[in-house]
């Protein structure tokens, strides 16, 4: 049993490492099954009325009423971790509850190391400041997240990371979108109210859109955003050191100009 206390002053630096914990008011309960010199199973229930901190020199973020239940199981290949009923408050905004499942597979003969993350639903806009402040992202990724300002809802999220690989399939993903939007950044177009599904890897992606009130803005090419009452399309993209290639083999939209169907190919060089 962990009593409600400010744990920030008790946690050793070798545990927090690059994270700065200004306050960690938390308590809960933990059950452990310890065998063969390591944890085999664990269950934890945590409630943190207040958490304040940041990663490295990034601006700190304050989180209130963080709650979760965690289940850990060691397997023959690695481990499974389930975070259930994860929820928190950011000011007046309540985020969650969310279920996250992390599976780790260690490298072995005939088997590569792999990390798999599944999430049922993520509301992006409230989550942005938390990720920016606490996630150990490379500076370029942190800059991209700040510039893109993602919003909307992601669901049925599946991520697969294979750290030993050097090709584009090192990271693979698939997810559903509901009214997702991003701001323009380095040739990537701004998007508003995109709904559908997306899958891909580090360099290539495939998006299937079925959206109402869709907005699309190539800020390096056109002064204004294209707006459509309805839009259905397949969008394919390729991103590398040369820039972004975006194409649509089929596109059907209804806007101020009426019904339009066709295809397009856009190349944006760095």
Question: What positions do the PLM features span?
Answer:
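Short coil-to-beta strand junction motifs in C2/discoidin
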Residues: 192-193
